[in-house]
From Swiss-Prot:
This is 17-beta-hydroxysteroid dehydrogenase 13. The lineage of its organism: Eukaryota, Metazoa, Chordata, Craniata, Vertebrata. Its EC number is 1.1.1.-, 1.1.1.62, 1.1.1.105. It catalyses: 17beta-estradiol + NAD(+) = estrone + NADH + H(+). Transmembrane segments: none annotated. Belongs to the short-chain dehydrogenases/reductases (SDR) family.
Length: 300
């Protein structure tokens, strides 16, 4: 195609996309049904994973629940069964590739082909870099991003065969902005955002438009992962608020889900700020939580 025509098409697409977004802002979008879908949720024994499981249970999905905590995942499954849905609980270490593949083979035999996966399992070690142990850095990447690769690689073939599925990546605003004393966590979440964007582009290039992708990026969430979090500019979110946005995003096939939604505007504007101004803005946020600094626990 002639380069001038391509540029013209690009401009038309940009204008159309903005107009479409404006219309969607005022007109509620149609939500898809997830009834009967086989949904795998990792980290389902607590926090965002548990609440997300309950929302899928309310919508009559078939649930496959993973967590390293046996008691937590079985409690979640029991609550879902009270809602009249089928829930299968598995104890799985999402940092162990062989265990992931073995468990997925078991799920395929016992339940069927997973059609929606929520890669939610995560871990964090708040500390300055020099106080962070090597094995903690390794574990952070194994759980927060490498597990996404192994799970998605194993599930994609059946999704691609049917051109149907949904892959959800639970990341964080920390995947867009570096935070002191969370270097391994931020790095793993940057990787998770990149995984989502790359996978989205690859599926489009392959013509697999029936496989949807979503990426959740909340600010600090009160799940207990980081102790006593606080910020000056952003709220510390409760789990139910985050999950409402996540479920709404999944049901409307939204690609990037920021919570709160206006954080996206902040991140976009920050890219245009001079480095000094950006540093001042970061200080204004006054992000605090308990972290190990110099091998001592301090508020940072």
């Amino acid at each position: 195609m002639n380069i001038i025509l391509e540029i013209l098409l690009l401009l038309i697409t940009i204008i159309y996309s903005y107009l479409e977004s404006l219309v969607k802002f005022f007109i509620p979008q149609r939500r898809k049904s997830v009834a009967g879908e086989i949904v795998l949720i990792t980290g389902a024994g607590h926090g965002i994973g548990r609440q997300t499981t309950y929302e899928f249970a309310k919508r009559q999905s078939i649930l496959v629940l993973w967590d390293i905590n046996k008691r937590g995942v079985e409690e979640t499954a029991a609550e879902c069964r009270k809602l009249g849905v089928t829930a299968h609980a598995y104890v799985v270490d999402c940092s162990n590739r062989e265990e992931i593949y073995r468990s997925l083979n078991q799920v395929k035999k016992e339940v069927g082909d997973v059609t929606i996966v929520v890669n939610n399992a995560g871990t964090v070690y708040p500390a300055d870099l020099l106080s962070t142990k090597d094995e903690e850095i390794t574990k952070t990447f194994e759980v927060n991003i490498l597990g996404h690769f192994w799970i998605t690689k194993a599930l994609l073939p059946s999704m691609m065969e049917r051109n149907h599925g949904h892959i959800v990546t639970v990341a964080s605003v920390c995947g867009h902005e570096g935070i002191p004393y969370l270097i391994p966590y931020c790095s793993s979440k940057f990787a998770a955002v990149g995984f989502h964007r790359g996978l989205t582009s690859e599926l489009q290039a392959l013509g697999k438009t029936g496989i949807k992708t979503s990426c959740l990026c909340p600010v600090f969430v009160n799940t207990g992962f980081t102790k006593n979090p606080s910020t000056r500019l952003w709220p510390v979110l409760e789990t139910d608020e985050v999950v409402r946005s996540l479920i709404d995003g999944i049901l409307t096939n939204k690609k990037m889900i920021f919570v709160p939604s206006y954080i996206n505007i902040f991140l976009r504007l920050q890219k245009f700020l001079p480095e000094r101004a950006s540093a001042i803005l970061n200080r204004m946020q006054n992000i605090q939580f308990e972290a190990v600094v110099g091998h001592k626990i301090k508020m940072k």
